[in-house]
Amino acid sequence: MSMKISEKKFNDRVGDGIQDSFMRGAVTSAQTRLYTNRLKAADELGNWEEWRELGEQIRQHTLENLDYYLMQLSENVSKRGGNVFFAKTKEEAANYIQEVAKKKNAKKVVKSKSMVTEEISMNHALEEIGCEVVESDLGEYILQVDNDPPSHIVAPALHKNKTQIRDVFKEKLGYENSDDPYEMTKFVRKHLRKKFMDAEIGITGCNFAVANTGSLCLVTNEGNADLVMSIPKTQIAVMGMERMVPTMEELDVLVGLLCRSAVGQKLTSYVTVAGPIQEEEIDGPEEFHLVIVDNGRSEILGSEFRQVLQCIRCAACINVCPVYRHVGGHSYGSIYPGPIGAVLSPLLGGYDDYKELPYASSLCGACTEACPVKIPLHDLLLKHRQVIVEKEGRAPLAEKLAMKMFSMGASSAALYKIGSKMAPVALSPFTSGNRVTKGVGPLKNWTEIREFPAPSKERFRDWYKEHKKGGDK
């Protein structure tokens, strides 16, 4: 899978999402639950806004000194016996991982959840050279078996219910029991256990890399990442270059923010800090590789969008987004959905595929308020719109013509006078009382579900002129 998850046009994807009543119900229920849990977990701290400010400061400081911390991380991983590869592009990252697999004659690979491996199409790259790649995160495994893309950063199978999951297992894996989550989890655990034991390579993502120790931190609720790191003889960790913290102290803060914001827990079931195996340790990989992926992040770092790199992938913004609630994750056409995806996807994937996403927002600001590291997401969406129109020149032709006509009318006193007199007459067939209740063209989509005020028949200038004559102040 690559970053782009659909070849359908944006409007078609949105239409599919709106028509999927089950998906919208599942998303609404999940958003409500996750939102409530996040508020409870935040209230336990008592000073949530101070923690957010601290998280923002840590992320900004790290990004401002990213070159230093990346070099420090690389040196410390190397000192501990690991191999570090800096990949400028997604192709370089995928090729390096392919080469490691070839040298190890690997045929079986097990991996834990990782957004950046999806971004670089890693599974496809390994399958090209004959490797079987198995997802070990339960949600990702469900989607892999069903050949279905993720719809959420933290809960990738959010759009499926337990009956649908049972049917997938029944059809693809020969599952014969009920749709009880415990029974299905037990079945998958037994199925995956052999995959862990047989794999020559284990591949993980990285929630945070600690510069001064050369350690990686993984946050999970299933423990699968721990098995991926400890059983296969070769481990490959893949991380975006921005996923850095200077020391364990900063890690402590950000892990707390991540767990509370993502799932409403003080900590997830497993928070693992590891790296290359040391002499005194009895388990872990014999060979360790860290792949640090740029793939456009350097350009973002030097742009007006650099704040998006503060993201810790908690999905708190997704869990409060009204647009996501109504259209679902697949409508975004990217592995990164929701507000964070609407900002990040055009930067990583380009405007050709994702130019509509910055407009898929009500600009209510709920995402900005929810973000634990205070990314001004709605402001960044507005910046995208500005770039699309002013720098890219990608505004639709109808919009360009409409704005041109408005500009001409608004900048000419004579045209403005004529237009203000003609507007009530032109809209009268579509007006009931003082409201426009039905429209034509682009107005039709608006008036199908709402009304807007009709232009006043009496212009302000005429009213003012009349009252001025009468001396009415």
UniProtKB/Swiss-Prot annotation:
This is Lactate utilization protein B. [4Fe-4S] cluster 2 binds at C321, C364, C367. GO terms for molecular function: 4 iron, 4 sulfur cluster binding; metal ion binding. [4Fe-4S] cluster 1 binds at C311, C314, C317, C371. It holds the Pfam family LUD_dom. SUPFAM superfamilies: alpha-helical ferredoxin, NagB/RpiA/CoA transferase-like. GO terms for biological process: lactate metabolic process. The keyword Iron applies. Residues 302-332, 351-380 form the 4Fe-4S ferredoxin-type domain. Keywords: 4Fe-4S, Electron transport, Iron, Iron-sulfur, Metal-binding, Repeat, Transport. It comes from the Bacteria.
